[in-house]
Design a protein with these regions (language model features):
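Beta-propeller folds
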Residues: 8-13, 19-309
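Bacterial N-terminal signal peptides that target proteins for export
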Residues: 1-8
């Protein structure tokens, strides 16, 4: 019976979409002569004009809007089927679900989803008892936005602040925000154009962030930002010039070091800084070499390295 229902919905949608498509002419991208120069030889690309890294060209945007309008017009007949399938998929998901708590410092941390809400709620509770505290309700943060995601968050060593990275465009270009967990209010500190990793120094005032190139979107710089200072004056502590390497920052499991992680297909590299000395320089743990990959953890005052050598 269910299969028959879907077949009827699909047949109706197909006939309707054909009728709709006949009423609307598909946009046609014009061809403009253009030669792409390359060390491996030149080639012709008549659609090169559609490339706009700034995403601001009125001509390109107008064409893309017409493409989207045509696609939406064509697909609108399938909306009943889309709604039916979406409802069935949602019906198979446990909506009131929580993660297993983990303990760090004086608190247990966990994530919860609530029925009818699309986004997670991040919470904590003191290990010695007390009331549950909402750190971030992503449902509230997402209100009024067509897209919203929190990629990463980290609580400060003094347990009073939470730094989080949000994206409201879908381009994975994140903005740093910092919330005071005592008041529930966000601080004025904001940095944009970031990747999805962050780390704290032990002073609970210094943050490490990865800046993306605004054109290529590749991670290129590690910035050190001190809370309360102008984000424009964030200190550059490392810059990667090899675009084959991905970059991230984090803390060791014992929180004694801040780490810059660098990785490519065939090699890795780690640079470390004493988390209690944010004014010190990052030190190279082991230099990158082709066909050499490693990871390291800091345990009881020494580094333990695992490698594929």
């Amino acid at each position: 019976m269910k299969i028959t229902s879907y077949c009827l919905l699909f047949s109706t949608a197909l006939l309707s979409s054909i009728a709709l498509a006949e009423q609307l002419t598909a946009p046609l991208a014009v061809q403009q002569p253009y030669t792409v120069r390359s060390p491996n030889g030149d080639r012709q690309d008549p659609y090169y004009w559609l490339r706009d890294d700034s995403r601001t060209s009125p001509t390109v945007l107008d064409y893309l809007h017409r493409e989207n309008d045509y696609a939406n017009h064509y697909a609108s007949a399938y909306q009943p089927l889309t709604d039916k399938l979406t409802s069935e998929i949602i019906g198979r998901i446990k909506q009131d679900d929580s993660s297993v708590p983990y303990t760090k410092g004086d608190y247990s941390y966990y994530r919860r989803y609530e029925t009818g809400k699309e986004y997670p709620i991040y919470l904590r509770k003191a290990v010695n008892g007390g009331t549950e505290q909402v750190m971030l309700d992503v449902n509230e943060l997402a209100k009024g936005k067509s897209y919203y995601a929190v990629s990463n968050w980290q609580v400060s060593p003094d347990q009073n602040l939470i730094a989080y990275l949000e994206d409201d465009s879908g381009r994975r270009q994140y903005t740093l925000k910092v919330r005071d967990l005592r008041s529930g209010k966000d601080l004025s500190d904001q940095l944009s154009g970031l990747s999805s990793s962050l780390a704290w120094a032990k002073d609970s005032k210094t943050l490490y962030l990865v800046k993306n190139d605004p054109v290529t979107l590749l991670s290129t710089q590690v910035l050190q930002h001190k809370l309360g200072q102008d984000p424009a004056n964030a200190k550059l502590v490392y810059e990667e010039t090899d675009n084959s390497f991905y970059m991230a920052v984090g803390n060791t499991a014992d929180d004694n070091y801040v780490v810059i992680y660098l990785s490519s297909t065939v090699s890795t590299e780690m640079r470390v800084q004493d988390a209690g000395k944010p004014a010190s320089n990052f030190q190279l743990l082991a230099p990158r070499q082709r066909d050499f990959q490693y990871s390291a953890g800091h345990i009881s005052g020494r580094w333990v390295i695992s490698t594929d050598w």
